[in-house]
UniProtKB/Swiss-Prot annotation:
This is Mitochondrial Rho GTPase. The gene is Miro. GTP 2 binds at residues 450-457, 488-492, 555-558. Residues 1-622 are cytoplasmic. It holds the Pfam family EF_assoc_2. GO terms for biological process: cellular homeostasis; mitochondrial outer membrane permeabilization; mitochondrion transport along microtubule.
Length: 649
């Protein structure tokens, strides 16, 4: 799959207006026939120039307007249909030049605003729309063959007062001087407009353009030293223009920057100020297309907003499939982490985390209340590389669109020179896993369900820490819905996501999205005689007839175990429904085998009823070997799961 760049318009529509007799029709006919017409009709018919004969390779329609044959109402319609309007004046007629400001520009503004008023609901919206969406204008001085002076000084003064004027050109329909250039400027005003990039009266970049270029600079600064060295500049050049930067040209560019911006070059590398100056210079010299090529390569549209197609390419996810990070996606995220881990301590401090997402509109999560409490961290409470990848794995499973969006913000498309789809792996459908009796996925979701006070939140948080004793007696004030970490299942790393299902009242029904998962963990407090009844009812109502593996867990097993006030005791209940015996869990005494068992159950979804394990022992043996051929022959699923009784009592 090739690189993705935001596309420009598929066609351009140019409208020519101006006073009678200034030569609008002659300009069109001279362009088409490449000779001056002896007889000129009142108005030329609309013509379309094929893409292969235009400099920008875009089909272009040229429309003539005649006040003799057409009405002002027709003019209004044509103005709104046009992408750019060329106001033609005669260089030997001062009145036609004066009427640019007294008649034509106010008229075009009024026609555009009339359309915007119909779409805007408030006066403020109308004013804002009128300022931001004015029709691009090109001023065309015809009949330059009749004078020996230029009108450019007068025209430049007009341009300062009307920012929608993109460019101006003097030409002659009779001698064909600058005829092609005139229509090229008109195309350019549509495809590579100046106004979104540059404030003419201030001679500087617009805030939106500057913000976009700052983001691009940061993304291209792959070593994070706030400079673009020769390697980074060459990579930037290849990604944007598909060609290397010749050493001589690179030296010349640096010399120009050094001459004009004293601190634009540092240690023979380009600073941010130098980078911004370079693009300002491109625009001042009429090379808008260079800056636009860069912006579009990095996902920006004509309004300097990130294009939705760039952020969210269509991704087909069949029913029963899930989404994971591909190897390339993980590799890219590792490189981003290492770039911003300035002190190389293997973790992101709050400040480093903030700097990392400075190229995004905002962070995808809260550092203090989300990522630090949903994935592994170090002793300082900072997110480790492992935790960083875990959090992205979590987001990719539950909100893959958001993952793609933030990968785009961070520059995946450019660094990997590919579509965002290359960062995502869509797993096969779950029904196929069941049919093949083995799952090839590496990320599983476990719903932890139980009554309030059962200890399910502590069970989830215990998955993130090496020493669970640290959590004893701790109040969990922040309600973190998901916790994610990795476990080894037959020598392969699997990510397990624990979702803490918040149940306010015992009689509240569970929603389908709260029930459906890869494995369910039903939690009761073994020291509370009324706790198991809720778990039993949940199982019978939602899971008894489903294909979802279920493990029943009794927490707080370090306390006195109480007989449950239910028809059956937990062990009897599990035996009746052919489930593994209850796994007794305690933050004080338990190790982490519970999480490995849950992941293993998710990896082998066909073994839902573990009372049938003896019948499936040969199959289980093969499945274990198929999941990880390098695993010792004695390690099979049966050993992992059936040992629940010995480990949990």
């Amino acid at each position: 799959m090739g690189q993705y760049t935001v596309s420009t318009r598929k066609n351009v529509r140019i409208l020519l207006v101006g006073d009678a007799g200034v030569g609008k029709t002659s300009l069109i006919l001279s362009l088409v026939s490449e000779e001056y017409p002896e007889e000129v009709p009142p108005r030329a018919e609309e013509i379309t120039i094929p893409a292969n004969v235009t400099p920008e390779q875009v089909p272009t329609s040229i429309v003539d307007f005649s006040s003799v044959e057409q009405t002002e109402e027709t003019l209004g319609l044509e103005i709104n249909k046009a992408h750019v309007v060329c106001i033609v004046y005669s260089v030997d007629d001062d009145d036609s030049l004066d009427r640019i400001t007294s008649h034509w520009l106010p008229l075009i503004r009024s026609k555009c605003n009339a359309t915007l008023e119909g779409d805007a609901e408030t006066e403020a919206e109308t004013e804002a729309a009128g300022e931001g969406l004015r029709k691009p204008i090109v001023l065309v001085g015809n009949k330059i063959d009749l004078i020996d002076y230029s009108t450019m000084d007068s025209v430049l003064a007009i341009m300062e007062d009307f920012p929608e004027i993109e460019s101006c050109v003097e030409c002659s329909a009779k001698t064909l001087h600058n005829i092609s250039e005139m229509f090229y400027y008109a195309q350019k005003a549509v495809l590579h407009p100046t106004s979104p990039l540059y404030i003419m009266e201030d001679q500087e970049l617009t805030p939106a353009c500057k913000k976009s270029l700052v983001r691009i600079f940061k993304i291209c600064d792959t070593d994070g030293d706030n400079l673009l060295n020769d390697y980074e500049l060459n990579l930037f050049q290849r990604r944007c223009f598909n060609t290397p930067l010749q050493p001589q040209i690179l030296d010349e560019v640096k010399a120009v920057i050094q001459k004009n911006v004293p601190d634009g070059i540092y240690n023979d590398a380009v600073t941010l100020k130098g980078f911004l100056f370079l693009h300002c210079l491109f625009i001042q010299r009429g090379r808008n297309e260079t800056t636009w090529a860069v912006l579009r390569r990095f996902g920006y549209n004509d309004q300097l907003e990130m294009c939705q197609e760039y952020l969210r390419p269509p991704l087909k996810i069949p029913p029963g499939s899930s989404t994971e990070l591909s190897h390339r996606g993980q590799k890219f995220l590792i490189s981003v982490f290492e770039r911003y881990d300035r002190d190389c301590d293997g973790a992101l401090s709050p400040e480093e985390h903030k700097m990392l997402f400075s190229v995004c509109p905002s962070s995808p999560w809260s550092y203090s209340t989300d990522i630090r409490k949903s994935c592994p961290i170090n002793d300082k409470g900072w997110v480790t590389l492992h935790g960083w990848l875990c959090r992205w794995t979590l987001m990719t499973l539950i909100d893959v669109v958001k993952t793609m969006e933030y990968l785009a913000y961070l520059g995946f498309n450019v660094h990997e020179n590919d579509s965002l789809l290359a960062a995502i792996h869509v797993t096969r459908e779950r029904r196929i896993d069941l049919a093949k009796r083995q799952s090839s996925r590496s990320v599983y979701k476990c719903h932890v369900i139980g009554p309030n006070g059962s200890g399910k939140t502590g069970l989830c948080r215990g998955f993130l820490v090496d020493e669970m004793q640290k959590l004893i007696g701790k109040e969990f004030k922040t309600n973190v819905v998901h916790c994610i970490n990795s476990v080894q299942v037959y020598g392969q790393e699997k990510h397990l996501i624990l979702r803490d299902i918040d149940v306010r009242h015992a009689l509240d029904p569970l929603q389908p999205q709260e029930v459906n998962c890869d494995v369910a963990c039903l939690v009761y407090d073994s020291s509370n005689p009324r706790s198991f009844e809720y778990v039993a009812r949940i199982y019978i109502k939602y899971y008894a007839e489903s294909k979802i593996p279920v493990m029943i867990v009794g927490t707080k097993c370090d306390m006195d175990e109480r007989r449950q006030d239910y028809l059956m005791q937990p062990a009897e209940f599990c035996a009746k429904y052919k489930l593994l015996p209850p796994h007794l869990f305690s933050l004080r005494t338990n190790k982490k085998e519970l999480y490995t068992k849950l992941a293993t159950m998710a990896a082998f979804p066909h073994l839902r009823h573990f009372g049938l394990l003896t019948e499936d022992s040969k199959l289980l043996w093969k499945a274990g070997l198929g999941l990880a051929a390098a695993t010792m022959l004695g390690f099979i699923v049966l050993k992992t799961l059936s040992a629940a009784g010995s480990h949990s009592r």
